[in-house]
From Swiss-Prot:
Biased composition range(s): Polar residues: 9-22, 33-43, 74-95, 113-124
GO BP annotation list: transport of virus in host, cell to cell
Main function: Transports viral genome to neighboring plant cells directly through plasmosdesmata, without any budding. The movement protein allows efficient cell to cell propagation, by bypassing the host cell wall barrier.
Protein name listed in UniProt: Movement protein
Listed Basic and acidic residues bias regions: 125-142
Skewed-composition ranges (Low complexity): 50-62
Record key words, sorted: Transport, Viral movement protein
InterPro entries: Luteo_VPG
Keyword Protein biosynthesis among record annotations: no
Lineage: Viruses, Riboviria, Orthornavirae, Kitrinoviricota, Tolucaviricetes
């Protein structure tokens, strides 16, 4: 059951501090050192649950730092949907194994050109997560 939107709340706060300082030439050829520190907090709450995500990072560089990517609600939603989607399993041989499995499997076409055949025996398979029962379904039928 979804609650009305006026009972749910989302907050997103972000702060960034960048400083530039003079340093000895042994530390930085440019004579300057750039430091950046950022903090982010996103919170989503409803009467029945609360989710909080906090991140912090810092970087140091002898060159000016590029602007960081600011966390956004859309990035959070996309990350959440990606994690909920069904996993895709891929079984494939590494390039080294493929190369080894194809050695000695050369043949010629009708023009005398060498053909290389590979038959690694590996396949790609996609699976779905088992479907969850909702409350209206009963386990007694199983």
């Amino acid at each position: 059951m979804d609650l009305p939107e006026d009972q749910a709340r989302f907050t997103n706060s972000y702060s960034l501090r960048t400083t530039s300082m003079e340093t000895p030439r042994e530390v930085s050829r440019s004579g300057r050192l750039y430091q950046s520190a950022s903090r982010s907090q996103m919170a989503y709450s409803r009467p029945t649950m609360s989710i909080i995500s906090r991140t912090s990072s810092w970087r140091t560089s002898p060159r000016p730092l590029p602007p960081p990517q600011v966390p956004s609600l859309m990035n959070s939603i996309l990350t959440s949907r990606t994690q909920q989607s069904s996993p895709k399993l891929t079984n494939s041989a590494s390039p080294n194994l493929r190369r080894k499995s194809s050695l000695g499997r050369l043949s010629m076409d009708r023009h005398g050109t060498t053909l290389q055949r590979t038959n690694s025996g590996f396949s790609t398979k996609e699976t779905e997560m088992p479907r969850l029962l909702d409350r209206s379904e009963s386990l007694s039928r199983y």
